[in-house]
Design a protein with these regions (language model features):
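Short beta-strand/loop motif that positions the catalytic acidic residue
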Residues: 205, 211-213
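Conserved HGGG/HGGXW glycine-rich cap/lid loop of the alpha/beta-hydrolase fold
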Residues: 2-61, 77
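Conserved alpha/beta-hydrolase "acid-adjacent" motif
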Residues: 218-224
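Conserved hydrolase catalytic core segment
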Residues: 84-125
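Active-site loop/oxyanion-hole signature of alpha/beta-hydrolase fold enzymes
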Residues: 37-40, 49-89, 93, 254-257
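Hydrophobic, aromatic-rich cap/lid helix
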Residues: 163, 172-198
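Short beta-to-alpha linker loops that shape the active-site pocket of alpha/beta-hydrolase fold enzymes
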Residues: 52-56, 118, 243
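Catalytic histidine-centered segment of alpha/beta-hydrolase-like enzymes
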Residues: 240-256
Length: 268
């Protein structure tokens, strides 16, 4: 573990394993410590680097208002560690940041694995449960109940198409972490559901990108992922069996195997 200075913030990071660098960019309401057993399993195939994004936990700082700031931070970590081009893995908001790293700093990226980025989420017709959840989130946030608002957001985001939500199955410490980092989680949602990176930016991406979606995710998540993949020339789609939005938790083995297979395909 250690820290990297990036634009006034000391970013906390952890690393384990040896081999191909695998940078994990966590989703909203998470930290370097909420990847569960996926970290240990990935360490068998590469050098796993995880970190608390700016605004979260041990990195501290105010909630971030632009994806590009997170992208700059991710680049700073890879540059500090002097890694060769990395396998950059992100889920949800972290997936948007992983893709933006391929846009801004392709020299640092070997391949991106992006699970269910909410890119252009606002352009898709919301479901009735989503409308209700968004109304609740907004009401709670306006009343200053940020922890409750973040819980409502993540409970909805991690819902399964067949009922229930991964949120209820998460370890209690993960849920506490989400509530403690509520303002950062809510900021993540706002900055990643729009049109960033732009379609023009995505069209410039030349490194391979794997856009994944879960077999247990609501149908709209497939449409969001398909829209993103179609905007990136070097992208392909992949369905992770048994997974919802929380793929590293829902289907750890399948999530790790996808990363291992991707690394194998890129190895000369």
């Amino acid at each position: 573990m250690g820290s990297v200075r990036s634009d006034g913030c000391d970013l906390y990071y952890e690393e384990v394993g040896e081999g191909a660098p695998i940078l994990l960019i966590h989703p909203s309401g998470a930290t370097a410590s909420t990847w569960g057993s996926a970290t240990e399993e990935l360490a068998r195939i590469g050098r796993v680097i995880s970190y608390d994004r700016r605004g979260y936990a041990r990195s501290g700082g105010e909630p971030v208002r632009s994806v590009s700031t997170h992208t700059t931070d991710a680049a700073a970590i890879l540059e500090h560690l002097r890694t060769p081009p990395a396998v950059v893995v992100g889920t949800s908001a972290g997936a948007t940041m992983a893709i933006d790293l391929a846009v801004r700093r392709p020299d640092l990226v070997q391949v991106v694995i992006a699970h269910e980025s909410p890119w252009r989420f606002t352009r898709h017709l919301p479901t009735v449960p989503q409308v209700a959840a968004l109304a609740k989130i907004g009401s709670l946030a306006l009343r200053g109940r940020h922890g409750d608002a973040a819980e409502a957001l993540l409970r909805s985001a991690y819902s399964y198409r067949d009922g229930g939500t991964a949120w209820d199955a998460f370890p209690e410490e993960w849920r506490r972490a989400a509530r403690r980092n509520a303002r950062a989680a809510l900021a993540d949602f706002l900055i990643t559901i729009g049109n960033y990176p732009s379609s023009a930016d995505l069209a410039t991406v030349e490194v391979p990108v794997v856009c994944t979606h879960g077999s247990r995710s609501p149908n709209f998540m497939f449409r969001v992922t398909r829209s993103l993949a179609s905007a990136i020339p070097a992208a392909r789609m992949h369905r992770i069996e048994g997974a919802g939005h929380a793929a590293p938790f829902d289907a750890t083995t399948n999530f790790v195997q996808l990363i291992a297979d991707t690394i194998h395909l890129l190895t000369p």
